[in-house]
Amino acid sequence: MGRPVTSQEEDARFAGRFLTSTEMDLWRTMDDFDKRHSIDVTRRFVAKRSDATRDETAAALLHDVGKSVIRLGRFGRSVATLLPVTASMRRYRDHERIGADMLLQAGVSKRTVDLVRGATDDDAARQLRAADDGD
């Protein structure tokens, strides 16, 4: 099953249905690949969790926002998951904490921050991880 083909404008409209203006500004800092991935993850997440709250859905859209401050490119990202070669690569591996800190500083809800940080292990957190893994 392939992912739906949508334009960047359609992706932004989809994200805008769930994100506050502050959150949307953060989402826009993500590179195009991560924005597309966030849409795919969110669609899988809400398909499995029809009662997802707005904060939970925002976490799905923003779960990789910490990567926006770490510009490694696709090859560098692959290497970063295998070897802690450089400080940038180590930061990439810590993108959840970085993203959660960005969201916290922006005044985003505690629930969204906790889900992005991976600080909870409830049903929503497990379903978000599964959606991120492609399940």
Feature locations, PLM:
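Non-catalytic interface/linker regions that flank or bridge core catalytic/transmembrane domains
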Residues: 1-26
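Divalent metal-dependent catalytic cores for phosphoryl transfer on phosphate-bearing substrates
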Residues: 15, 24-135
